[in-house]
């Protein structure tokens, strides 16, 4: 079965059991291929996510003159060209659906000697980019967007960048990363502060590639003119992908699964804290470190969940996991309240609206607010769900179908391949009732 099918039929399967290996982390895979391309020397990447988004980023660096070998689906050998070795592309650089790729590349390309154009698919072409182009312009970059601040990004090369002290108005790891990457090329020091701490993948991996960077929660600082040294990276399993199985095992009676070597970046694991507030049974084991990132096995067993007020401080640390959390909330006893999550309205879809509408279609009462929702736990029924081409919405409702009193049809699931190729096959093997329709 392939994620490229048009829709899924999800219905009750069996309790989830066994040990599952989740594909590599998308955020780490993007950065690994990007930083390896900018490094001096040859880097080997193991556990690379073979998804559409990460393939787009790798293909862009190939267009920029970087040789990338693919010994296997989950490996890349990158022949770095150094920070000053990228070559002018012959045409537009297509980021596909990858907001991470586009925003981080904007920081890198802003400092090159050549012009470039970053484009994306229909979904990415609706996403806000001024949050990135604004601070880059403060550094001296020249980047044009559409009149509403959306892609394509037309990057004018040959600009001399200056380091800045930037207080980001949004808690966004992508904005922070774009500014820091431009800062590598800038004169002087570049520092970024955030209203709330965000994921520090960029900081950890730049350090792994030999860059001197000072960082702590909500703060990062580096000086320009540094070079990256090639290194080998082992990409951990993607926490956001694991999240769907964490939630599924928590709400499907009789379940007990182990998820191997999952990345547990402290700015990524808000979902674990939220689920534990709701009574989930999640145990961490075999802690280690892969490529500067903390990892552990997660043992998850079914537990009756109860509604909870989700602390706003957790929101930036679980921004991609809210679709899965909403399904957990629907299955819980009582009400779950989410606030401070307006960022969900400008993801691959308006995730607050999409999840609220979808859960209502299955009989769950949801009170939507501008920055969140109250989900009243109940019984999930049958219905037809529009995923709006959003991979995380699609996977969330595949879980919902496992508790449905009937069947859940999830439309437009092709984009699941952007982050989790093979999700449906892995889910079936674990016990999901899930089938594909053309």
From Swiss-Prot:
Q: Name one GO molecular function term.
A: 3-phosphoshikimate 1-carboxyvinyltransferase activity
Which Gene3D superfamilies does the entry link to?
Answer: Enolpyruvate transferase domain
Provide the binding site for 3-phosphoshikimate. 26-27, 31, 172, 174, 320, 347
Question: PANTHER family from the entry?
Answer: AROM/DEHYDROQUINATE SYNTHASE, PENTAFUNCTIONAL AROM POLYPEPTIDE
Name its cellular compartments. Answer: Cytoplasm
Q: Which PROSITE patterns match?
A: EPSP_SYNTHASE_1 (PS00104), EPSP_SYNTHASE_2 (PS00885)
UniProt xrefs under CDD domains: EPSP_synthase
Q: Which domain of life is it from?
A: Bacteria
> Record-annotated residues binding phosphoenolpyruvate?
26, 99, 127, 174, 351, 392
Active site: residue positions: 320
Query: Which biological process terms from the Gene Ontology are attached to this UniProt entry?
Result: amino acid biosynthetic process; aromatic amino acid family biosynthetic process; chorismate biosynthetic process
User: Which pathway does this chain act in?
Assistant: Metabolic intermediate biosynthesis; chorismate biosynthesis; chorismate from D-erythrose 4-phosphate and phosphoenolpyruvate: step 6/7
| Function of the molecule | Catalyzes the transfer of the enolpyruvyl moiety of phosphoenolpyruvate (PEP) to the 5-hydroxyl of shikimate-3-phosphate (S3P) to produce enolpyruvyl shikimate-3-phosphate and inorganic phosphate.
Record key words, sorted:
Amino-acid biosynthesis, Aromatic amino acid biosynthesis, Cytoplasm, Transferase
Per the record, the gene is aroA
Q: Name one Pfam family in it.
A: EPSP_synthase
Tell me which EC number(s) this protein carries.
Answer: 2.5.1.19
**Reaction(s) catalysed (UniProt annotation):** 3-phosphoshikimate + phosphoenolpyruvate = 5-O-(1-carboxyvinyl)-3-phosphoshikimate + phosphate
Q: How does it assemble?
A: Monomer.
> What are its GO cellular component terms?
cytoplasm
Q: State the similarity comment.
A: Belongs to the EPSP synthase family.
Q: Which species does this protein come from?
A: Xanthomonas campestris pv. campestris (strain ATCC 33913 / DSM 3586 / NCPPB 528 / LMG 568 / P 25)
Name of the molecule in the record: 3-phosphoshikimate 1-carboxyvinyltransferase
Q: Does the keyword GTP-binding apply?
A: no
């Amino acid at each position: 079965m392939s994620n490229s099918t048009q829709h899924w039929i999800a219905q009750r399967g069996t309790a989830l059991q066994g040990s599952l290996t989740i594909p590599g982390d998308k955020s780490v895979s993007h950065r690994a291929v990007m930083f390896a391309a900018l490094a001096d020397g040859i880097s080997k990447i193991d556990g690379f996510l073979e998804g559409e988004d990460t393939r787009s980023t790798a293909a862009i660096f190939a267009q920029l003159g970087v040789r990338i070998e693919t010994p296997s689906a989950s490996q890349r050998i990158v022949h770095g060209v150094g920070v000053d070795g990228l070559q002018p592309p012959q045409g537009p650089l297509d980021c596909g659906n990858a907001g991470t790729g586009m925003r981080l590349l904007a920081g890198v390309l802003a400092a090159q000697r050549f012009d470039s154009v970053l484009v994306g698919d229909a979904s990415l072409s609706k996403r806000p980019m001024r949050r990135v182009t604004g601070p880059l312009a403060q550094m001296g970059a020249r980047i044009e967007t559409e009149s509403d601040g959306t892609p394509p990004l037309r990057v004018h090369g040959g600009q001399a960048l200056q380091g800045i002290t930037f207080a980001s108005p949004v808690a966004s790891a992508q904005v922070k990363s774009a500014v820091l990457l431009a800062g590598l090329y800038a004169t002087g020091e570049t520092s970024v502060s955030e209203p709330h701490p965000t994921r520090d993948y960029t900081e950890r991996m730049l350090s792994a590639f030999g860059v001197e960077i000072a960082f702590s929660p909500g703060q990062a600082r580096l000086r320009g003119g540094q070079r990256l040294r090639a290194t080998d990276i082992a990409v951990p399993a993607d926490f956001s992908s694991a999240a769907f199985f964490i939630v599924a095992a928590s709400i499907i009676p009789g379940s007990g699964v182990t998820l191997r070597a999952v990345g547990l970046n402290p700015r990524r694991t808000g979902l674990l804290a939220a689920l534990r507030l709701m009574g989930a049974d999640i145990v961490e084991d075999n802690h280690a470190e892969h490529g500067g990132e903390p990892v552990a096995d997660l043992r998850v067993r079914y537990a009756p969940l109860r509604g909870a007020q989700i602390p706003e401080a957790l929101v930036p640390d679980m921004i991609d996991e809210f679709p899965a959390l909403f399904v957990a909330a629907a299955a819980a006893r009582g009400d779950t309240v989410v606030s401070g999550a307006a960022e969900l309205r400008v993801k691959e879809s308006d995730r607050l609206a999409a999840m609220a509408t979808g859960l209502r279609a299955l009989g769950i009462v949801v009170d939507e607010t501008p920055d969140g929702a109250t989900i009243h736990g109940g019984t999930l029924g049958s219905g037809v769900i529009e995923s709006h081409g959003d991979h995380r919405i699609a996977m969330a409702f595949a879980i919902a179908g496992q508790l449905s009193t009937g069947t859940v049809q999830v439309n437009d699931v092709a984009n699941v391949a952007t982050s989790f190729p093979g999700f449906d096959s892995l889910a079936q093997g674990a016990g999901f009732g899930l089938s594909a329709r053309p």
